[in-house]
């Protein structure tokens, strides 16, 4: 059965191929021939029921692919590109003759917009290649389509000639159905274009052609006007360069011409398409412009960012600077040690410290004297303790200001070079205390001083004087001592007499005093005098309730008499180290200070014994043994 089937199929297929070739030659449309084949071979198929219907194949003639562009678009592109190429060649020749050499764009425009120059050069190269290629392709298509001259410009749409892209518009397209059943038949479907769609396409194509022709005409007019104006400008520039001075009328004419050039250039703007964006560029012709206008000219590219105004930049920068904190601001530490602090911040001088120290010292001493009165309350003792604290603190402040070092320097210089410092300056070096209303107090007199040649050793310890152990005069007695036995300081007036505490508070006998060095013997004498004065004051306080203030005047008179007697008998004072006979003679002649005691006072002294004297001695030693400027750093 397989052999018969293969033999029976072979002549039928051959016959159908021959019939198809004949129909193709006569121009008859192709169609299936299944019914003819079935009519002739019906007996054979009826005899063999198992044999299926044969598969038929039809040949389809494929039409050649049409071009992607319409004839109208090809012609318009050829005409436009040819005109552009001619115009560019003319401009290149003019620039080469004038020596510009930049190509397409001025030098200042190249500096302002280098991206514009690169775009123009790239576009010119691409357009030249495209124009040459399109011209060749257009000529070949025109020669190939001369046979079918029935078509007119604008009647065919671009991208619609390809029959394969839209299968519904192809009249030769047919659908073949393959059937394996006995009663299946193939049918062909023919679709034709509608008349309304054809009319709309013709109207659109006509509008496109008219727009292309208008662009061509406007471009030709602009090119001719630009060439004419550029020639006129070159002629005027050459004439203006030959002449040395140009009148105001000529400058106005040149400005008018420049305005015309700008208007024509602005009208002759063209658009270039890069991808999906349209970029507006100036025309290729760039007429000569004055330098001030060329500096003001800016590139007209839409995609180039415009620089912001300078005022806005300055405002933003100033605003930014105001908000930023400076790094170099001076910083002050939270705490400054006492050593690093400036003395000027306290506004305290050395004189202020000295006066405060001395005044507080004598206030303390006077308070201690009045503190022995049993009628006083406990507030006096508290005040005395506070005064002692003030004295110690002020003494330490005085040492920090280095006043002691300065005083020692002045003293050393005065001892080594006594004639170098005048008496007026030497007086100023000695610290004094005086009333506010009184003049400066003169230093103690030196008339009672013993000459240096009279003693070769200390009067108290007999230590010989050498280069290292120097001689020191006591300002009160005038004798010569070593440094170890001349270390006390007390106030003396101009006659080298002691100034007591009460007198110092009242301004002193002579209106003030000077702080001077005294020996140990003079200190004992001062203590005895202070204790005597204290006893007299305490007794007078008890009597003043009845007698009044008459006793105060008596005490002052007694003190004055004491000083007069002391001055008279200063030469007859006994000296340590002398013989017993000398002491005896001196004791006979010397006078002691007058001590006035009442009967009640003598009785009190007899009852109490030596307890009160011991207490007074302790008080006197405390007052006189510590110098006024003593502090912890003087060891």
Swiss-Prot record:
It holds the Pfam family FYVE. Residues 620-635 are annotated as: May be required for TORC1 activation. The modification Phosphoserine is found at residues 46, 53, 73, 113, 124, 148, 165, 174, 300, 309, 381. One of its GO terms (biological process) is positive regulation of TORC1 signaling. One of its GO terms (molecular function) is amino acid sensor activity. Zn(2+) 2 binds at residues 474, 477, 519, 522. Changing residue 337 to A: Mildly decreases interaction with and activation of TOR1 in response to glutamine. Sensitive to rapamycin. Residues 1-110, 123-181, 224-254, 534-557, 570-623 are annotated as: Disordered. GO terms for cellular component: fungal-type vacuole membrane; mitochondrion. Residues 543-553, 601-616 have a biased composition (Acidic residues). Zn(2+) 1 binds at residues 458, 461, 482, 485. The keyword Zinc-finger applies. It is a peripheral membrane protein. Keywords: Membrane, Metal-binding, Phosphoprotein, Transducer, Vacuole, Zinc, Zinc-finger. Residues 304-440 are annotated as: Required for interaction with TORC1. Disruption phenotype: Abnormal activation of TORC1 signaling in nitrogen-replete conditions (glutamine or leucine nitrogen source), and during high hydrostatic pressure (mechanical stress). Increases cellular levels of glutamine and alanine during high hydrostatic pressure (mechanical stress). Sensitive to rapamycin (TORC1 signaling-inhibitor), caffeine, and high hydrostatic pressure (mechanical stress). Abnormal TORC1-reactivation following inactivaton by rapamycin (TORC1 signaling-inhibitor). Resistance to tunicamycin (endoplasmic reticulum stressor) administered together with FK506 (calcineurin inhibitor). Residues 238-254 have a biased composition (Low complexity). The FYVE-type zinc finger domain contributes to vacuolar localization. This is Glutamine sensor PIB2. It comes from Saccharomyces cerevisiae (strain ATCC 204508 / S288c). The gene is PIB2.
